From Swiss-Prot:
The active site is at K100. Keywords: Cytoplasm, Schiff base, Thiamine biosynthesis, Transferase. This is Thiazole synthase. It comes from Halalkalibacterium halodurans (strain ATCC BAA-125 / DSM 18197 / FERM 7344 / JCM 9153 / C-125) (Bacillus halodurans). The keyword Cytoplasm applies. Homotetramer. Forms heterodimers with either ThiH or ThiS. The keyword Glycoprotein does not apply. Catalyzes the rearrangement of 1-deoxy-D-xylulose 5-phosphate (DXP) to produce the thiazole phosphate moiety of thiamine. Sulfur is provided by the thiocarboxylate moiety of the carrier protein ThiS. In vitro, sulfur can be provided by H(2)S. One of its GO terms (cellular component) is cytoplasm. Belongs to the ThiG family. Pathway: Cofactor biosynthesis; thiamine diphosphate biosynthesis. InterPro entries: Aldolase_TIM, Thiazole_synthase_ThiG, ThiG.
Amino acid sequence: MKDLPLSIGGKTLTSRFFLGTGRYPNPFVQNEVIRVSEAEVLTFAIRRVNLQAPGEDAILQHLEGKTFTYLPNTSGAKNAEEAIRIARLARASGLSDWIKVEISVNERTLLPDPVETLRATETLANEGFTVLPYTSDDPVLCKRLEEAGAAAVMPGGAPIGTGLGILNPYNLGLIVEEANVPIIVDAGLGSAQDVVQAMELGADGVLMNTPVAKAKDPVKMALAMKHAIEAGRLSYLAGRIPKKRYATASSGLETFISK
């Protein structure tokens, strides 16, 4: 299978690694992680950014002189109205017209609210935003988000920050099969093994923050995740052998040497 470039909202990306910018030990580690990951899309919570002066913001000022696609998120929003308001403020500040819709009402699980996420996605897409909604691994909901105008859909592998990996690979596979927009797995991953699995299932990319930022060595983990994305994608394109119940000899019995 021939690979195709990843294109979202009219922008072609060479990296399939979407990287979060929070929770790093310090800005120097963050910058080194960004460098080795070769990520082109960086995400951050809008509520953590000084929208009055984005260029002087404590987060963004460390990225000056570099070219990235910013994917601000609406983390902290409890409903569609809050998410829409936050997105409009971000765009008005000149920050970005890309937006990751993230709406959670349960602080214990941080699972996305499906109804509010769908409402916000439809409204923001109609207003010209490039919308990437974070959602659950529900194939029907993911399709509805696509139909509502999402430029890409971002199902979670597991609840945010849990490191549990891909809890429902069957659903994720169905989501990929049915999608006509890129599928970016977001949330719940913990290791390079999880990333390879996501990519082998056909995901177009992976968004990570905690698995890298909170690793014992974030820079090494960023490099591991980068290679895992590449390996998983290559394995998906190569096509794995089918699983079956019984063994098949790699050399047929007729090849035995007879005396």
